[in-house]
Amino acid sequence: GSEMCIRDRLRPDPSSTPIVTDTNFAESYYQNLGRTWERMAFIKARPVSGNILKGKEFLSNISSFIWRNHFDYAAIDDVKNLREKMKLNSTHLKSFNLSGYNIKIGIGGIRDIELFTQTYQLVVAGRQQELRGANTILILKKLKEFGWLDNRSFETLVDAYILLRTTENRLQIINNT
């Protein structure tokens, strides 16, 4: 059977709070103490079970945390530091080697394309609401339409993303994961 991995550290102030907190606490935490990686996680967040309306209300209430009204160039350094930390903690990111290459987190993999896309979103989607969304390919298309990406970069990123996601899905089928 399949198992669901729950990462209990991915919550507001994990070292000092219970696994479940009320939404008022969570909203206050994110508005006052939330970090860039948490903003990135919420870019793709959506309610999938329980009270869907409450989930949508929560996301609406923290939208000013996710989407800053100013061009958030500090997010670029935060993402760069995040990527460096990821690199230190993964043998897949220390060098490019096709033998044992990890298409999800390896250099130039799925995560790199998503980090690239989400970094643009963090920087400019507070003002350009059309750049808000969870679909990486649609956001890349909008980045091209708004002049943030040239045609060649757009095509390269989209082609690579589709190839990597297709490969990932096929590997998951083969490995039953």
What function would you assign to each model-found segment?
Residues 2, 7-177:
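A nucleotide- and high-energy phosphate-metabolite-utilizing enzyme signature
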